[in-house]
């Protein structure tokens, strides 16, 4: 019998238990952990919400553990966590960062009215050109499962080197697992136009993982009226831990508060977008 894989000290599941009608599910990115969403999770918990940020399968331990997982496994982890919250609460809101945003889109579409609102951070419908090309080519490699772990050229995409160094995340990535992220990109893109969930799209202008054009692509694909976009001019990919973290947390909490209160939607000049007064979201710096 194999010993259980060790869990990174700061990378464990985060949960703040509360009663009430609503709960929030926070989903982290590929090779990362719930740690990157802690500022958001803690702030939402202070609003009296039950908040769960699960450690997705294969994460928060050793890169070798991730090698045995794929998009379908991370999706299964997200479904399990959502349904656990939905068993205890009427509505579940989803906050997803990076791969977690892709998971959130699919989950919100699948669970329909049980999902009260969706916050998408750094949504990687397409990665940077080089990485996207490498992953597409990797999918065609024979025996990709036996391919060795690939060293990351850079650490977590956050502007403060000190923050990046303190983040619990893998410094190597299994190529087959990373390549399966394309399945998530395709699944999310297919469902965006069919979503009926109020959605807030947040993105850093200097995102090196998922270029900022992803945010506008998401907004353009969404067809429901209640959608909002905020671009943070100084931030990179890991929004909740970057230099505009306070704004990211404030905007996320304000959006969820507004949707929970079912505030009216006020149309903007752009027919594809609307903003709720309480959130005051716009496609500018916060």
Task: Please tell me what each predicted stretch does.
Residues 31-41:
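The serine-hydrolase catalytic nucleophile loop
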């Amino acid at each position: 019998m194999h010993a259980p894989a060790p869990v990174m000290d700061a990378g464990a599941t985060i949960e703040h238990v509360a009663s009430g009608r609503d709960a929030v599910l926070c989903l982290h990115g590929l090779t990362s952990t719930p740690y990157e969403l802690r500022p958001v999770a803690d702030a939402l918990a202070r609003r009296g919400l039950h908040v769960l940020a699960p450690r997705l399968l294969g994460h928060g331990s050793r890169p070798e553990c991730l090698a045995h997982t794929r998009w379908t496994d991370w999706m299964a982890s997200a479904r399990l966590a959502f349904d656990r919250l939905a068993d205890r609460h009427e509505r579940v809101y989803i906050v997803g960062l990076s791969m977690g945003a892709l998971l959130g889109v699919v989950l919100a579409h699948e669970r329909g009215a049980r999902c009260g609102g969706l916050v998408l951070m750094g949504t990687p419908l397409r990665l940077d050109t080089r990485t996207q090309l490498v992953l597409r080519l990797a999918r065609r490699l024979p025996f990709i499962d036996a391919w060795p772990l690939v060293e990351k050229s850079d650490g977590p995409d956050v502007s403060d080197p000190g923050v990046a160094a303190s983040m619990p995340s893998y410094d190597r990535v299994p190529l087959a697992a990373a390549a399966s992220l394309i399945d998530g990109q395709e699944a999310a893109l297919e469902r965006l136009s069919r979503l009926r969930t109020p959605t807030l799209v947040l993105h850093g202008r200097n995102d090196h993982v998922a270029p900022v054009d992803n945010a506008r692509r998401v907004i353009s694909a969404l067809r429901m009226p209640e959608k909002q976009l905020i671009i943070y001019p100084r931030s990179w990919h890991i929004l909740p831990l970057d230099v505009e973290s306070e704004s990211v947390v404030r905007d996320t909490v304000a959006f969820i508060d507004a949707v929970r209160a079912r505030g009216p939607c006020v149309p903007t000049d752009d027919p594809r977008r609307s903003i709720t007064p309480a959130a005051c979201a716009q496609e500018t710096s916060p």
